[in-house]
């Protein structure tokens, strides 16, 4: 699920945040970015 990390990772409104990427990688994604305080896995 692309949004599996949204509730687990807090992040800044804009830009990139390491916890988001780490969470996404744990779920098998390549990484993630933060958009509007939410983590989006890529």
Swiss-Prot record:
Disulfide bonds join 5-23, 11-34, 20-39, 24-41. GO terms for molecular function: outward rectifier potassium channel inhibitor activity; toxin activity. Coiled coil: none annotated. The keyword Cell division does not apply. Its main location: secreted. It is found in: Secreted. GO terms for cellular component: extracellular region. Blocks human Kv11.1/KCNH2/ERG1 potassium channels (reversible, IC(50)=3.4 nM). At high toxin concentrations, block of Kv11.1/KCNH2/ERG1 macroscopic current is almost complete. Does not accelerate the kinetics of the closing process and has no effect on the activation and inactivation kinetics of the Kv11.1/KCNH2/ERG1 channels. This is Potassium channel toxin gamma-KTx 1.10. The lineage of its organism: Eukaryota, Metazoa, Ecdysozoa, Arthropoda, Chelicerata.
């Amino acid at each position: 699920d692309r949004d599996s990390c949204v509730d687990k990772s807090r992040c800044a409104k804009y830009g990139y945040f390491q916890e988001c990427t780490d969470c996404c990688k744990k779920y098998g994604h390549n990484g993630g970015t933060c958009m509007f305080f939410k983590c989006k896995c890529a």
